[in-house]
């Protein structure tokens, strides 16, 4: 057969039909060059040298495996959306050269994903940024309600992707033509992601020519999920769901909230965790399954446990205690009788350091009285008294005259000035008691009840303290629309979770000194429990409203206005507090990421460029 066409010249142009003149010309040219072409494949129109048969067979097997990596299988449900991402301008010339054709197919399947399209411009407002393990994602402050994001469909996981049963005419193409999602002129531009072009799945569809000739089975899609694209889709899905909630479009919100776990599963690290907590909070709000306040012994004990782990895992509470103690220590300079009122004593972890500093003071320690305020316990145990006993034992070991009183109050607004005065009558011959009031992450809870903050500040004024220390989250989660609050909290807690991830490798200063083999495991437990601690705050900010929403964080500027209107003025924190706080952070893993800044006499601690908590000190304004 080869000799019969020996005199024919030229080469095949691309036909695949048996018996065509172009096929004959191709086979003849190969024979004329002395190459042994497989006659069976040549009869079908494909030029394969006998010496290349093993290589071609191996490449075909690799191609079959690559096309099977999309998780498709028999009996799978159709998903026509995959075909819409294919381009129409990628042509593989000379498909009769089967070896080169298969090799080009493999290179296309293994090609890197196309560049991301620009995120949709949802409005003209300035966008913020959420950091994640995969990069930085822009957060538009609002989402257009007409956005096609409400039609968001999930990206199937490799184990759960489905094969289309009935492909449209668009899906069944000439097997010698392959489309990719990389061209701006392709049909995928008109059917990009439901995020308005913000993210796309990369889809490749192809079938080997021999298989296409022998079997008319439609080609199966291969899905390559890019985590950065999925991250952008995840952020926009969260924001679109929040806007649907704000507009009371519950059907759209319900559809979107079901997509968030699918998108979050493609992420890693902090982004996946924070998205899971926000997705849960949105689901609770959409389905009206609000978190109940701690009303059992187990819940109260668990909340205390989470607080203790958060203290150990990251420097935020340590920074709050250290800077507040430094301001109180300077205010108590030269005083012989001092009294501290702690609005949220918890386990009393703040005060051993202050007692120790007072014990080392030149001239000896003063007489120290501590009033600790805490909520009632569900089992009516006196947890406050147990904290007092531990502190009294510590004070005894360092020879500090110590007195303690615990005050049980459901809310700080229940306090009256007489409760904070010394028991019994003071000796007129003794030096008057100098009072300091301390509040760490407590003031913002008062904003849930109208007039409660003003009542508490009036009580504080009545006892005439020398100094009032206030530590609060540096965030605005208490004003604007629900979508504004949601966007701000998503930004804030994404940064907080990033800082936990960044500081998880080496733990806190206690691990450096102990050198225990169990330190890495303990650090991992602290981080997980700290994430749960923050997750509860997220749930309260997003899922709750009215008096139930107690996590009403405000910025330092807002607190400055509130305290100024109540008759207080700022006490500048000294340079010693700044220097020693910076030294403290150097002991933590990820210390390079933590930043201490001085802001109008106050100190803030943040992660990289984002402040997260702020310490301020106040005194009664002059007449």
Swiss-Prot record:
Q: Where is the composition biased (Gly residues)?
A: 9-19
Outline the segment boundaries, as ranges, of region: Leucine repeat II (LRII).
386-425
Q: What is known of its domains?
A: The DELLA motif is required for its GA-induced degradation.
Question: Which PROSITE patterns does this UniProt record tie to the protein?
Answer: GRAS (PS50985)
Where this protein primarily resides, as one coarse class?
nucleus
Q: Residue limits of the GRAS domain?
A: 225-619
Q: Name one GO cellular component term.
A: nucleus
Highest taxon of the source? Eukaryota
Q: Low complexity compositional bias: what residue ranges?
A: 121-131, 181-201
- Record-linked Pfam families: DELLA, GRAS
**What are the boundaries of the region PFYRE?**
435-540
**Any idea what job this protein has?**
Probable transcriptional regulator that acts as a repressor of the gibberellin (GA) signaling pathway. Probably acts by participating in large multiprotein complexes that repress transcription of GA-inducible genes. Upon GA application, it is degraded by the proteasome, allowing the GA signaling pathway.
Q: How is it modified after translation?
A: Phosphorylated. Ubiquitinated. Upon GA application it is ubiquitinated, leading to its subsequent degradation.
Q: Give the Pro residues compositional bias ranges.
A: 111-120
Q: Where is this region: VHIID?
A: 307-372
Sequence segments annotated as region (Disordered): 1-27, 109-138, 159-201
What's a GO biological-process term for it? Answer: regulation of DNA-templated transcription
For the motif DELLA motif, give the residue ranges. 38-42
**Name of the protein in question:** DELLA protein RHT-1
Motif span (VHIID)? 338-342
Q: Biotechnology applications of this protein?
A: This gene, also known as the 'green revolution gene' has been introduced by conventional breeding procedures into several cultivars. It produces shorter plants, increase grain yield at the expense of straw biomass, and are more resistant to damage by wind and rain. These wheats are short because they respond abnormally to GA.
Please provide the record's keywords in A-Z order.
Gibberellin signaling pathway, Nucleus, Phosphoprotein, Repressor, Transcription, Transcription regulation, Ubl conjugation
Instruction: Show the segment(s) annotated as SAW.
Output: 543-619
Q: Which positions does the motif LxCxE motif occupy? A: 239-243
Q: Where in the cell is it found?
A: Nucleus
């Amino acid at each position: 057969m080869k000799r019969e066409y020996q005199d024919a010249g030229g080469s095949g142009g691309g036909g695949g039909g048996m018996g065509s003149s172009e096929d004959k010309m191709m086979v003849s040219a190969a024979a004329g060059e002395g190459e042994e072409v497989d006659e069976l494949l040549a009869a079908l129109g494909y030029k394969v040298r006998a010496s290349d048969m093993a290589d071609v067979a191996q490449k075909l097997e690799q191609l079959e495996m690559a096309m099977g990596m999309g998780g498709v299988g028999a009996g799978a449900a159709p998903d026509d959306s995959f075909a819409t991402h294919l381009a129409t301008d990628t042509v593989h010339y000379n498909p009769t050269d089967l070896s080169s054709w298969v090799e080009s197919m493999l290179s296309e399947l293994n090609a890197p994903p196309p560049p991301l399209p620009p995120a949709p411009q949802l409005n003209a407002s300035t966008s913020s940024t959420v950091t994640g393990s995969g990069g930085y994602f822009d957060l538009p402050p609002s989402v257009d309600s007409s956005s096609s994001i409400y039609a968001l469909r999930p990206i199937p996981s490799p184990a759960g992707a489905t094969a289309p049963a009935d492909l449209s005419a668009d899906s069944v193409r000439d097997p010698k033509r392959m489309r990719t999602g990389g061209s701006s002129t392709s049909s995928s531009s008109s059917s990009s992601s439901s995020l308005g072009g913000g993210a796309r799945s990369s889809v490749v569809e192809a079938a080997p020519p021999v298989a296409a000739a022998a079997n008319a089975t439609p080609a199966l899609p291969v899905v390559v999920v890019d985590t950065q694209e999925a991250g952008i889709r995840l952020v926009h899905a969260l924001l679109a769901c929040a806007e649907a909630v704000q507009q009371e479009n519950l059907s759209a919100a319900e559809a979107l909230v079901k997509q968030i776990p699918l998108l979050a599963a493609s992420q890693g690290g902090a982004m996946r965790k924070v998205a899971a907590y926000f997705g849960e909070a949105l689901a609770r709000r959409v389905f009206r399954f609000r978190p109940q306040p701690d009303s059992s012994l187990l819940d109260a004990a668990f909340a205390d446990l989470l607080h203790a782990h958060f203290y150990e895992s990251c420097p935020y509470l340590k920074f709050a205690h250290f800077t507040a103690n430094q301001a109180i220590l300077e205010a108590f300079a030269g005083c012989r009788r001092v009294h501290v009122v702690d609005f949220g004593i918890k386990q009393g972890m703040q005060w051993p350091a202050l007692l120790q500093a007072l014990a080392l003071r030149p001239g000896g320690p003063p007489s120290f009285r501590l009033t600790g305020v805490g909520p009632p316990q569900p089992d009516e145990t006196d947890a406050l008294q147990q904290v007092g006993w531990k502190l009294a034992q510590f004070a005894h070991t360092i020879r500090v005259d110590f007195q303690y009183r615990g005050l049980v109050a459901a809310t700080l607004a229940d306090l009256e000035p007489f409760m904070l005065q010394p028991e019994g009558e003071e000796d007129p011959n003794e030096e008057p008691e100098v009072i300091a009031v301390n509040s760490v992450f407590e003031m913002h809870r008062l904003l849930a009840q109208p007039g409660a903050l003003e009542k508490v500040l009036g009580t504080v004024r009545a006892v005439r303290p020398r100094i009032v220390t206030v530590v609060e989250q540096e965030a605005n989660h208490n004003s604007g629309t629900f979508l504004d609050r949601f966007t701000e909290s998503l930004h804030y807690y994404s940064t907080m979770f990033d800082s936990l991830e960044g500081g998880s490798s080496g733990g806190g200063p206690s691990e450096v000194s102990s050198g225990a083999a169990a330190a890495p495991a303990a650090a991992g437990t602290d981080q997980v429990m700290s994430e749960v601690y923050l997750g509860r705050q997220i749930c309260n900010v997003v899922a709750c409203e009215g008096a139930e929403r107690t996590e009403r964080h405000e910025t330092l500027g807002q607190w400055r206005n509130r305290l100024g209107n109540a008759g207080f003025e700022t006490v500048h924190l000294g340079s010693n507090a700044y220097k020693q706080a910076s030294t403290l952070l150097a002991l933590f893993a990820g210390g390079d990421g933590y930043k201490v800044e001085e802001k109008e006499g106050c100190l803030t601690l943040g992660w990289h460029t984002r402040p997260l908590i702020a310490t301020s000190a106040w005194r009664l304004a002059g007449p």
